[in-house]
Amino acid sequence: MFIEYSRLPGFESINISFSRGMLRLAKFTNFATYKQKLEYFRLLAGSNKYIQRISVADFERHPDEINYIYIILISILQMEECMPVLVLCPTVYWVRFHWPGKCSVNSLNFTNETLKSAFHAVFTPYFALMKKVLGRIKNNMLLFAEPHANLNNLFVKHFHDLIYKSVKDEKTGEAILYLRTNVNVPNVFIDDKRAVFHGDGMKIGKFTGKFLCFSFKRTIRWSKLDSVDSFAVTTVNYRVSVNWEKTPRKTFLSLDSDTKNLHYISKKILNKKGKNATTSKTTKSSCTSENVCDDKTFSVEFPLTTSAKTEYLLRSNFSLEKINESNNPTLQELTLNRTHRLYRSNFRNEQSTTQRKFEKIGRTVSTDSGNKLLTFPEQKATRDSNPFSIELTHATVISSDESALKDTTNQAIAEMQRITPAIAKTISRRTANWVCSNPAPDPYGEPSTWSRILTPNLKIISESSPYYPVHLASPNSTFSRDQSVRSVVMRRSSVCVEKQNSFFRNYEHFKNILSRRTIKVKTSCPRLSVDVSDNKRENLSQEHLILPNKSREKVNRFKNCLHRVAEALRAAKENWDQHNPRNSIH
């Protein structure tokens, strides 16, 4: 049989069906004569002709074997009742009952053909259902096995919030105590002692049952979890104790023919305070029939209330007790204090692992504003890398008047005012090629390659770079000279005062570059304006003066780019002259 232990919504029908099976088992155990047991057995078996053939004489000669067949029958009934939910629940215990007749039935040592036929008629569907249930449970456990494979299923499904809350509050304890859902299980007595369910087994009547759990072998790799040898059914490896407590609740089960023959005697006793208390006690019936049970009859208690259709549901407090480290050191994560340490160490390991992985990609540089850090990505060396690089030195033009920037309509000057001062930018061939193929937007029209290199839009670079992003922790950081162009942080300061000749020196540098490029363009422009008539085409082809179509388009685009850059620099100079007089600004 199966019992669910995670207290998750939607799985209540498993425990309800388990309770129904326990009621049937307790009733079968509590019958005084073999005839009563056999009649109830036939009632549950329905139209199974092999069960109907069993006689009272067979029961008298082979009581243990028939009891074990009955256990298999109620297990089949539970699986049929809750099959849609059972196959979706990984947090179940498989309760295997060790009846005295199990060994003889499994080995088929008895010679009674009637019992052999009855056993095969019950065990064949039982085996098919168990195969289906175990396969479906395994498939569902694969959904959450990898992230939490080293933890018990109960911790993964039930204690997740509790563990993290305890870690956050830094609380430790010797045991985890939680309240289980109400399960309608009868209160079974053995020699006037209440039964205890635990990992070693539960005792009801003459037989015991062990709790088995489903898990994956920890030595199996994640890629092989779906293999045949990865799934394991093992005995519960921690002690689970149950303290039964009587609580009046409306019954889950109707008092039909399945439970109406249970006998009980109730008495009302006046306690010391004068209030009525309901107690119940089952007395052993004295049977003198020939088919009376030779073994001791065990009692089942069902207290009465004012309503005949109300029973006592038994609320159970399950607790996972602390396991001695010397006995089983691999199960220390099952206790809260050990779990607290385990998770704390896991957090440290994850942080150190993440830090080591991140250090392989980039380097961390401290900033001047507070203790924040900025991480600069470093490109790994590739075969395509070239030591050749283009070095362009930029000086920053910073305006102290913040209101002037609001009135500025030229975006190019705004970009130049926010470039960090005195930073030498080194653009590798790989970066330059990417910049040329992905130019930044230009306010004057089509994208400009040279404006992209001279005044790069670093925000767009950090967002659309195909290699490594820029991680910025502080917007007011200052950096050293050895940083790449992707590490540049645009900054505007209203306190710094910049010398006037910084702009003019930068302007002259741009002007010289433009003049040299303009000369080259002018030498190639007459070729573009040549009249390609039929009379002159032969002469031009002989002198090799015709440019390919792609080259002509490139020259036209480059000419337009130079024109826009010149216009931008001219507008920047006019804006600078307008807002920055010769005297110093404080």
UniProtKB/Swiss-Prot annotation:
Inducing factors: During anaerobic conditions.
Domain of life: Eukaryota
GO CC term, one of those recorded: prospore membrane leading edge
UniProt source species: Saccharomyces cerevisiae (strain ATCC 204508 / S288c) (Baker's yeast)
Name of the protein this chain belongs to: Uncharacterized protein IRC10
